[in-house]
């Protein structure tokens, strides 16, 4: 059976061949050459000094011959892999010659972005994953890792060559990709990629005004100070009330589930991106960001917890929390904390205890009020998006 190659893969293969050719030429250029004295101006050939120089050059050439042969064999093996379509082995080439991570293109909002999308409760939407790896665009009989959010699938080797799998993360993806918890690809894991160029510019301006250093973790003091500065109006030195400051502290704790005393930059950036989406986007625009898998999980939750075409407000409140339910830490398969993308089973002990605790916190009248499917979706959309990252952090803590 032949190898199916797309135009994009053909371009990548040509780039790899160019890298291999450059490496081969560098090896030839670095090879010491034997110069004959009689061929150069001012030659000392025939003298004692010239004879000694020729002997030394011959010895250097003999010593470098095994190295040149080894480099030649490596390059020849690389050519064979490229010819057979097997790609470049990362352990034999520098990182610069591996697969190049994609250049992310930020989305643009359409003119009808704020119009209500057509997301009906029935009929259900079919969920079908892609057949080809999103990186190499080749179908193979090997196991493909599906994303839990979108329909993309990936080879572990392609993810490794792009630098997205390092160390124990390969084992993590292998264990989690085919479970109920699942694994988010590098597109869906980064919530900041949901922002447009204009929205990202606004967020960057806020970071600069509040003197936030990118790629640095934040302590609780840093986080609360930033929230004060971001919400500051006029000349007031204190922008948050005591209640808002306590809410910021609770959000910090949600972003730091392992209680390390600091929040990673990626989690902080995802949190701020969600807040900006809430501030600038209408609900209909947020609904258009949901993927078919996320819409289907929302339908399954609504039908399982609701009564026909409605669901109680208490269950709707519970659903907002259940998107972030984690697997029990004592379970053998839970060595890595990853956000759940849907409610856990009602029959599980964790679900029962969580449900009873939340019901105790809710007023009794909430259980008697019901909301329809569109309302349920609007109230849950931002939390469904917030549950995308693989991180165990809760990037937007629901109230209550």
From Swiss-Prot:
Residues where Omega-N-methylarginine is found: 36, 307
Sites of N-myristoyl glycine lipidation: 2
Alphabetized Gene3D superfamilies for the sequence: Zinc/RING finger domain, C3HC4 (zinc finger) (3.30.40.10)
GO annotation, biological process: detection of mechanical stimulus involved in sensory perception of pain; gamma-aminobutyric acid signaling pathway; regulation of G protein-coupled receptor signaling pathway; regulation of synaptic transmission, GABAergic
Keywords in alphabetical order: Lipoprotein, Metal-binding, Methylation, Myristate, Phosphoprotein, Zinc, Zinc-finger
Keyword check for ATP-binding: no
Repeat is among the record's keywords: no
Zinc finger regions, PHD-type: 129-190
UniProt modified residues of type Phosphothreonine: 47
InterPro entries: EF-hand-dom_pair (IPR011992), KIAA1045_Zf_RING (IPR031946), Znf_FYVE_PHD (IPR011011), Znf_RING/FYVE/PHD (IPR013083)
Positions bearing Phosphoserine: 43, 51
Composition bias, Basic and acidic residues: 29-38
GO molecular function: zinc ion binding
SUPFAM superfamilies: EF-hand, FYVE/PHD zinc finger
GO CC annotation: glutamatergic synapse; synaptic vesicle membrane
Pfam families: zf-RING_15
Region (Disordered): 29-65
Protein's recorded name: PHD finger protein 24
Origin species: Mus musculus (Mouse)
């Amino acid at each position: 059976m032949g190898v199916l190659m797309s135009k994009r893969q053909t371009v990548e293969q040509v780039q790899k061949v160019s890298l291999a050719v450059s490496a081969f030429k560098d090896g030839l250029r670095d090879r010491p050459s034997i110069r004959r004295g009689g061929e150069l101006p001012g030659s000392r050939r025939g003298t004692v000094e010239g004879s000694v120089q020729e002997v030394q050059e011959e010895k250097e050439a003999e010593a470098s011959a095994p190295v040149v042969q080894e480099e030649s064999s490596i390059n020849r093996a690389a050519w064979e892999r490229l010819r057979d379509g097997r790609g470049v082995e990362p352990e034999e080439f520098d990182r610069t010659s591996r697969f190049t991570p994609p250049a992310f293109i930020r989305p643009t909002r359409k003119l009808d972005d704020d119009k209500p999308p057509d997301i009906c409760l029935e009929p259900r939407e079919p969920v079908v994953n892609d057949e080809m790896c999103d990186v190499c665009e080749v179908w193979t009989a090997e196991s493909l890792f599906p994303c839990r959010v979108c329909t993309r699938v990936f080879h572990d080797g392609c993810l490794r060559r792009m630098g997205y799998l390092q160390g124990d993360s390969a084992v993590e993806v292998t264990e989690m990709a085919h479970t109920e918890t699942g694994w988010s690809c590098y597109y869906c894991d980064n919530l900041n990629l949901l922002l447009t160029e204009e929205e990202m510019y606004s967020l960057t301006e806020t970071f600069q005004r509040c003197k936030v250093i990118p790629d640095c973790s934040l302590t609780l003091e840093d986080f609360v100070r930033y929230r004060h500065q971001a919400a500051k109006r006029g000349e007031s030195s204190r922008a948050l009330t005591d209640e808002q400051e306590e809410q910021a502290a609770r959000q910090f704790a949600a972003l730091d589930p392992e209680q390390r005393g600091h929040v990673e930059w990626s989690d902080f950036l995802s949190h701020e991106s969600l807040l900006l989406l809430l501030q600038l986007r209408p609900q209909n625009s947020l609904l258009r960001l949901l993927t078919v898998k996320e819409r289907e999980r929302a339908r399954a939750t609504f039908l399982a917890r609701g009564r026909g075409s409605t669901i109680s407000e208490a269950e709707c409140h519970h659903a907002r929390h259940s998107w972030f339910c984690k697997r029990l830490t004592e379970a053998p398969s839970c060595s890595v904390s990853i956000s759940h993308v849907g409610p856990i089973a009602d029959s599980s002990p964790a679900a029962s205890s969580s449900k009873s605790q939340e019901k105790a916190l809710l007023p009794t009248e909430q259980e008697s009020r019901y909301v329809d499917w569109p309302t349920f979706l609007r109230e849950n959309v931002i939390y469904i998006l917030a549950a995308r990252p693989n991180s165990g952090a809760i990037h937007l803590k629901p109230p209550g």
